[in-house]
Amino acid sequence: MAAAVGPLGDGELWQSWLPNHVVFLRLREGVRNQSPAEAEKPAASTSPSCPSLPPHLPTRNLVFGLGGELFLWDAEGSAFLVVRLRGPSGGGVEPPLSQYQRLLCINPPLFEIHQVLLSPTQHHVALIGSKGLMALELPQRWGKDSEFEGGKATVNCSTIPIAERFFTSSTSLTLKHAAWYPSEMLDPHIVLLTSDNVIRIYSLREPQTPTKVIVLSEAEEESLILNKGRAYTASLGETAVAFDFGPLVTVSKNIFEQKDRDVVAYPLYILYENGETFLTYVSLLHSPGNIGKLLGPLPMHPAAEDNYGYDACAILCLPCVPNILVIATESGMLYHCVVLEGEEEDDQTLEKSWDPRADFIPSLYVFECVELELALKLASGEDDPFASDFSCPIKLHRDPKCPSRYHCSHEAGVHSVGLTWIHKLHKFLGSDEEDKDSLQELTAEQKCFVEHILCTKPLPCRQPAPIRGFWIVPDILGPTMICITSTYECLIRPLLSTVHPASPPLLCTQEDAEVAESPLRILAETPDSFEKHIKRILQRSAANPAFLKNCSARSSEKDLAPPPEECLQLISRATQVFREQYILKQDLAKEEIQRRVKLLCDQKRKQLEDLNYCREERVSHLFRKSLREMAERLADKYEEAKEKQEDIMNRMKKVLHSFHAQLPVLSDSERDMKKELQLIPDQLRHLGNAIKQVTMKKDYQQRKMEKVLSPQKPTITLSAYQRKCIQSILKEEGEHIREMVKQINDIRNHVTF
């Protein structure tokens, strides 16, 4: 290992010491040791006149990350240099500035590596070049720090050549694009797109024989004269340039021409140079796997005369449903297309209604178009020889953590693109057909934002210097991009966290429905919140990226010195961007904040007055409430006292009654009672005699009545006066008898008591 550059503090972050790590010194030495002709290529034509531009340089990506480690490909040593970004460092351990591991290839590749790609299972790394491909198997980890083979300085790694005989025998063929099959459950498979317009799928178990082959050329173009046929199709832009897999979906059995059931497969989107996109479905779940029929070209809406460009170079499928395709062109245009099911009225469906697969061809709806600033556009005269637009191939890269962000790398630098409208699109697609609010929110949503991270061609006379690679490191304070320049300088730039997903909730947290949510948080999450308003004001349409000082490690500063006029233009451009995109927007945000603060102060004063009034009302309310409660308590006590008083009175009556009952001398009332009782028998005898008299009179009258009613005797006819007299006499006698009976009953009851 190399010696340490300097001591490292315990509390320092990796962002501060990583650019000074010894691995970059080693890689820069490897660049200096290259052949002079190879090293002078990037420095050619650096004079101020700049008569011509060199051909496009290959865009490399020789960096990837795994966990807390950074892997850098050393082309000179055919090895990976592994740096731990968050490794433990205790006492007596060598400082991290000189500590790294070297993963050496046992069978090094014989071709130049342009890209390294980690497999979905994270056990293999694809070493991709234009003339071949190899798969490097990562060694095992063990030890307390979980390092490769316990932390050895150099570790041998086995490599698997992919399609070695094919590339050796076909010298005219080149590898255009390569990607891993996205399944983590199967054995690793890698997908290759070659210049003969054929996609081949290889398994690491049988790396020389393709498992599946997808021929993209038409039947009439497949002739014995392959070179002439390929040149003809390439001139028309009918060759595939890139592909990408989408998320796993369930595909109808008609696509695979099966009769039993539907198949679970990955959609494979294939981009042609003329801008057309084709679709097929790949399923390797069951051996030997299934390949769907090639569908397309997919119709694009709204239609464009130029089919959205004839210089397409890259395609990327964002991992969301519905799928969102990003199509890049060499002129710097990015098209964000939503993949939706085709309409029944589609012309293509009507023309191919005889084909059952035509019903399954989706459509691409171009949601927005974005133009990247590949090279800085400086204010210049009309007769500027560099007025023509700069163009170069663009590579699209997924963000390892954020599904709504992706990155673009090209010869002139690096861009980062974030899509803020994906969640609004999901809301709109998940809403009812009559729900227009979600559609209005989707149309009102701000477009994607573009960050110009790095510019390697700040001046027109500068030659492009494509980066060696980059990687996104997630952090608690936001994502950070690590860029490795062509001279192996390490640049660390933080990314905007606007589209960065929120941290998931902890397992120990439980939602409590009774706990009310903070009104400030509710206000901040509303679509019209002040925070989002300030963010919209501060949203920049342009930025000043990081500039590279030198484009080549072997070129002198005198050769690379730009003309003073272009330096002035560059400074003017940077000043204008700072003025318009930073200072002016910050002044506007400041005015809005001051206006908001004034309004909030007025609201605060009014709320304080209302608060004082509420406090007074609360005090009076509490006083009235206390009086009411006191009155209720007194009423309860009064009722209890009244009940106790009645109870005591009843007890006193009983006591007095028992007391009088035990006296030896009769009281006045008792004596009166005694006299009344003594008079009762006489009254009873008198009443008895009266009853006997009445009874005798009744019997007498009864006998008289019988005699009167007897038929032997003549009927006695009474006059009206006589009847009236008799009725009055009987009435008086009846009342007299009734009174006597009542008196007798009263006396009887009294005596019984």
Curated annotation (Swiss-Prot):
Gene symbol of the encoding locus:
Nup88
Q: How does it assemble?
A: Interacts with NUP214/CAN. Interacts with NUP62 and NUP98.
Q: Which is a Gene Ontology cellular component entry for this protein?
A: nuclear envelope
Query: Modified residue Phosphothreonine is at which positions?
Result: 526
Its keywords, alphabetically, are: Acetylation, Coiled coil, mRNA transport, Nuclear pore complex, Nucleus, Phosphoprotein, Protein transport, Translocation, Transport
Give the originating organism. Answer: Mus musculus
Name this protein carries in UniProt:
Nuclear pore complex protein Nup88
The job of this chain, per UniProt, is described as:
Component of nuclear pore complex.
Q: What is the lineage of its organism?
A: Eukaryota, Metazoa, Chordata, Craniata, Vertebrata
Which regions form coiled coils?
Answer: 623-663
Q: Which residues carry this modification: N-acetylalanine?
A: 2
The cross-references to InterPro entries, in alphabetical order and at most eight, read: Nucleoporin_Nup88, NUP88/NUP82
Query: Where is this protein primarily located?
Result: nucleus
